[in-house]
Regions:
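Rossmann-fold NAD(P) dinucleotide-binding segment
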Residues: 55-119
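Helical "substrate-binding/catalytic lid" subdomain
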Residues: 171-285, 289-292
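NAD(P)+-binding Rossmann beta1-loop-alpha1 motif at the extreme N-terminus of oxidoreductases
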Residues: 1-67, 94-95, 130
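Hydrophobic beta-strand scaffold residues
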Residues: 31, 51, 120-122, 163, ...
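NAD(P)-dependent dehydrogenase/reductase Rossmann-like domain
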Residues: 275-346
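Rossmann-fold dinucleotide-binding core
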Residues: 78, 101-181, 311, 329
Length: 346
């Protein structure tokens, strides 16, 4: 499907944003782009993308504004900076296509900001990492006004292989949180399985052979598990972002009164791993399960009676509090500024 509308992408220099922007341009769309570190987006000019110096310049004349940034603070900050260049008096009004993974509360805030400025809002996070993004094979979790879909379809066609309609704005983010809980759980379980195999002197390849062809043989686990065994952590999706996403899952569970003790532990592991390996692929969570074997030599023989593990119920409050602090500490100031700005514009 063709469109004459200009597309502006805020966050065009990241692993995902760069690939998505390039695919839009290669699909024949008129694309303008901005990235906080301009150098990371400059190569897009080779595909005809206008790389702007500011968000306001990037959105000038655009009918659709895409945000693909690391967290809620970056999203709200970029969109606030873009507002002076956005003309909401046009018919039809501009649409803010928010594709970052930012959580429930931040998504509601973004919708409020858009509504206060006469801008349409569609919440459409994506499933997929760098490689599917480069191939234009992302899965898009669309939510928002259905009448916006025809205008957005050319963008979806350029970057994705499938669009799932989730419902009203915000439902896409909720679905993404649910999917992330599964993906992060699978990778963390795989990391501990590979670490256990190696610790017991078992070749991880034997594990994969044991489950090969069965319902336990998950292609994604095989991909990430092979990377762990090979110590290949070239980032497709950074561990720091996986930890951020884990805090969003923990936050939603807490808000909705759910008891997820297993995921609380997974979130802790990802947060711990991100402290040292945040810029590596999130399969590097495996490294948190591989202590110095020399230091542990003979430990089994000299260890005393095993202490009982604290119950999940006992661990839950502390784990969730830490996860939530991590989730909101950085973007909090930006969210407050955005909320104040939205209130004064009504």
């Amino acid at each position: 499907m063709e469109t004459s509308e200009t597309i502006a992408v805020l966050g065009a220099g990241g692993l995902m944003g760069f690939a998505m922007t390039r695919n839009m341009a290669r699909a024949g769309l008129d694309v303008r782009a901005w990235n906080r570190t301009r150098a990371k987006a400059e190569a897009l000019a080779d595909d005809g993308v206008h790389v702007a110096d500011t968000p306001a310049d990037a959105v000038r004349g655009a009918g659709i504004v895409v945000t693909m940034l690391a967290d809620s603070g970056a999203v709200t900050s970029a969109f606030e900076q873009a507002l002076p260049g956005l003309d909401a008096t046009t018919d039809p009004h501009p649409i803010w296509l928010q594709m970052s993974t930012i959580g429930e509360a931040a998504t509601r805030l973004c919708e409020s900001i858009a509504n206060s400025r006469g801008v349409g809002f569609v919440d459409a996070p994506v499933l997929g990492t760098r490689e599917p993004a480069e191939r234009g094979e992302l899965v898009i979790l669309e939510s928002g006004p259905e009448e916006a879909r025809p205008r957005l379809q050319p963008v979806f066609d350029a970057i994705g292989r499938r669009v799932i309609r989730a419902g009203e704005a915000g439902a896409g983010t909720l679905l993404k949180i649910v999917v992330n809980s599964w993906v992060l759980s699978v990778v963390e379980a795989g990391a501990e399985t590979i670490a256990l195999a190696e610790g017991l002197g078992i070749d991880p390849d034997l594990f994969f052979k044991a489950v090969e062809g069965s319902s336990l043989d998950l292609p994604y686990l095989r991909t990430k598990g092979s990377a762990m065994a090979a110590r290949d952590f070239k980032p497709s999706f950074r561990l720091s972002l996986a930890a951020k996403d884990a805090t969003l899952v923990a936050e939603s569970a807490l808000v909705h009164g759910l008891d997820l003790p297993l995921f609380d532990t997974i979130a802790e592991r990802l947060l711990d791993g991100a402290l040292e390996h945040g810029d590596e692929d999130f399969s590097a969570t495996y490294l948190t399960s591989t202590p110095d074997r020399a230091a542990l030599s003979g430990l089994a023989e000299i260890a005393g009676p095993r202490r009982p593990c604290p119950s999940a119920a006992a661990r839950q409050p502390a784990l969730r509090k830490r996860a939530l602090r991590q989730a909101v500490s950085q973007p909090a100031a930006s969210l407050r500024r955005a909320a104040t700005a939205a209130g004064t514009r009504r």
